[in-house]
Amino acid sequence: MFKNKVFENIFSLGVSQIANMAFPFITMPYVSRIIGPEGYGILNYSTAFIGYFVLFILYSFDLSGTKAISRNIKDKEFVNMAFSEVIYSRCILYLISSILFMLSLFFGKALHKDYVVSIILFVGLISSVFSPQFIYQSFQDLKIFSKINLIRGFINMILIFLFVKTKHDYFYIPLFTTVFNIFINIGLFGYAKRKYSLKLIKQPLNNVFGVIFNDRFIFISNVIGAFRTTTNTIILGFFITTKEIGYFTTSINFLFVVVNVFFIPISTAIYPFISNSFSKSVEVGNDVVKKIVPITIYFYFFTSLCLLIFSPLLITFIFGNKFDESIKILQTIAFVPLTMGLCNLLGVQVLLNYNFDKLYFRINLFCNIVGLILNFFLSKKFGYYGAAWNLIFIDVLTIVLCFYFLKILKINIIKWKYFSPIVIKSNLISIIKAKKLN
């Protein structure tokens, strides 16, 4: 039986993400002044490109694998089979990615300027094959991530100060990231196998491809969802200078510092909690969602408001006066934490837990096709401001469509009395005091 570890996991993931971001915050003022906007542009362009391979290798298993295991956590045979299917599938996806990456190096002109950075980042993708997040997430045991990331962040900070001395030393940053990711993920993978007595069962190829095929809708939804960030950067590369990309990606990366610290811990921790609630009954799961909706909306609205108000102070303090142009961009996208939080709540937490994978996929596909077409026009016409507006537009369109289809399906996730601060406090206390999930 599980103890309710939702808030414990949110806290642990929050500490983990703070560690991931706090140490870069310390190094950012130093690094930004050495490598400048152009160096940041090179790093961020390569990172955005390699990000597609990360999505491909991770596939949808942090969602589908977590949901399957958390709903059958007591069935040891099922857990081992699901665990093995994920790992073998990722191995196949990594081999396919290797072929695609080599082709992109030969034919992708944009990568020729910084192919060393791209190669370093791609080598690090072996860590994605053994990424154990879905395992720890399924067992609602995420405390270890905070400890590991504190140690990694401190060592990485020291190495950056020691090795990054000139504007040509920017390649050390992805190098350190690659090395740490490989060792940490493989180590956590081995530890999870021992702790939960997991067995890696050999999977036939037809079974592996069957798993990949069955999860295609969630995977494609994740990929096209990534268009909201990475594709903006890729498209901008056709219309603006590397220096201007540096301005845009600085604001985007700072935004996702906020998202990683506040958004990811909450969404990651509540997903298995909601999924387990739906395993009891649809009614129980729906009631849990209704209680969580107002809590997340208030929290993300306050976070976005703070980001809007304090953007000038934060950008100037961290990056220096050379990045003043990033302030207006960050203010334009300040409410993305709120819109992104609503997209995740309606799509991942609700539609996927109701098993509407195809609907989730179709909504994301439509919104991102519209956003992709519009992004070319806006980026060409308005530069990085156009890309920023497009980011907001896709989120808002997704939210509207999710609400529309939930209404058609007669799924009501809004209970207005739960928006009362007094009721929110009561619901928080009841969740914290809950001793068991089943």
Where would I find each of the regions flagged by the language model?
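Interhelical loop/hinge segments that connect adjacent transmembrane helices in multipass membrane
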Residues: 1-6, 143-146, 170-177, 186-229, ...
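Transmembrane helix-bundle signature of multi-pass secondary active exporters and lipid flippases
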Residues: 47-55, 225, 248-268, 272, ...
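Signature of the first transmembrane helix
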Residues: 4-62, 157, 216-243, 253, ...
